[in-house]
Amino acid sequence: MAELTISAADIEGAIEDYVSSFSADTEREEIGTVIDAGDGIAHVEGLPSVMTQELLEFPGGVLGVALNLDEHSVGAVILGEFEKIEEGQQVKRTGEVLSVPVGDAFLGRVVNPLGQPIDGQGDIAAETRRALELQAPSVVQRQSVSEPLQTGIKAIDAMTPIGRGQRQLIIGDRKTGKTAVCVDTILNQREAWLTGDPKQQVRCVYVAIGQKGTTIASVKRALEEGGAMEYTTIVAAPASDAAGFKWLAPYTGSAIGQHWMYNGKHVLIVFDDLSKQADAYRAISLLLRRPPGREAFPGDVFYLHSRLLERCAKLSDELGGGSMTGLPIIETKANDISAFIPTNVISITDGQCFLESDLFNQGVRPAINVGVSVSRVGGAAQIKAMKEVAGSLRLDLSQYRELEAFAAFASDLDAASKAQLDRGARLVELLKQPQYSPLAVEEQVVAIFLGTQGHLDSVPVEDVQRFESELLEHVKASHSDIFDGIRETKKLSEEAEEKLVSVINEFKKGFQASDGSSVVVSENAEALDPEDLEKESVKVRKPAPKKA
């Protein structure tokens, strides 16, 4: 039998290997306990090192976000099924803040506020992840708005133009066409998408907050039928979701859009609507016992929206020149735009389009109130051709509304007043536009030219829309060089204007009004004299007293 020998060197080597591989580090894990839970909120004790906005893991893989950091407990918003969370259950820290997957694979998909697909089309291969609470671009990282974002809606592109990187508020009562305006804007980006040019393409994100499931489905169907889903992502937080999801949904959509913006691409994001996000945040704050302020909203509700909308920007060329344009929607009550949330968002954004229920009920759609609507920075992005033809449009419509109210009580009017009323009625009719039928900017320029230069004065009001559509078809079929020139040069040259006037007059000769009469060709049609308008506005403000 062989003798077993152990050398001292072997023993020494084994000990050295063990010592070198030994680690005295221990993992320290904080575990909290649920004190109470309900209505999507849980209070947890025993997590002294937790960070604000940190993700917490509840039993069953349910996640929560730490919002309130009190001395002895943590108030968390539950993201998921909170019904199964009970008192006494253990809660673990994750050491992470909330983030969502992002990338081009999200185009054409419907996701929830956690970035998980809910359209039944399988998993999404994300390129990377992006934190929801991301700092907005600083002043030196931005540049001024200079490129137009065409909505395809005549009233907006002519009077309240939107530029890439702008925040334009869409505000109005319920059922006034706010969502329709935004969906039309998304549909209008299709031509730019088909060019394949990254400098022209616009990727769209539609964030549905607190909407009915049927409403979200109808928007998705409209986008699919218009061929717009291939460049659109829908982030859905329907009314049936917990308040936490409605609060997070806009930040999720913003994170998805910012990924493209920082890669030098252009993004359009629609928040439909931020009133419901504010309501959800109010519910969360009250359940967390935060002190209420005006209309029971918490003190930081302004910051809730400002830090979201400030992420929309036109980045500097050093950062790629990408942009994210925001169209937040706010719902008013009884056309009151002086309420708390509307005034907050108006002060944050770069302009607003106010949709009025009275105009909507009169059949003026889109029901844009010209007097209250404004675009503070979009004018710099408007193409020169539109500036030239639509320069007097806002003034003409405002004076028409003023004179219309006065004319209702006046028995007789002079010729200048009647001419202004007739012109205004035709302009109102001209700016009406059916839903889901956006117009290219060159078609809009020709249409607005018809109204502001007096070429519709001899057309009966009830035939204005038919005259416009048939003329545009005629120009497209027989004189497409007019459209091509406007599209390529962004201007309406003198030669093109002269040709357009002759085309309009020729078209009038063959146009039959609905009553069978022919339209008078006015060779010298022109805009109303500004001096006459000024005199009329003075007369309106100071009408002569009637004789007894």
Curated annotation (Swiss-Prot):
PROSITE patterns, sorted: ATPASE_ALPHA_BETA
Span of the signal peptide: none
GO cellular component, one term: plasma membrane
Disulfide bonds: none
Catalytic activity as recorded in UniProt: ATP + H2O + 4 H(+)(in) = ADP + phosphate + 5 H(+)(out)
Keyword Ion transport set for record: yes
Subunit structure and binding partners: F-type ATPases have 2 components, CF(1) - the catalytic core - and CF(0) - the membrane proton channel. CF(1) has five subunits: alpha(3), beta(3), gamma(1), delta(1), epsilon(1). CF(0) has three main subunits: a(1), b(2) and c(9-12). The alpha and beta chains form an alternating ring which encloses part of the gamma chain. CF(1) is attached to CF(0) by a central stalk formed by the gamma and epsilon chains, while a peripheral stalk is formed by the delta and b chains.
HAMAP family: ATP_synth_alpha_bact (MF_01346)
This protein's name: ATP synthase subunit alpha
Organism of derivation: Mycolicibacterium smegmatis (strain ATCC 700084 / mc(2)155) (Mycobacterium smegmatis)
The organism's taxonomic lineage, starting at the top: Bacteria, Bacillati, Actinomycetota, Actinomycetes, Mycobacteriales
This protein's encoding gene: atpA
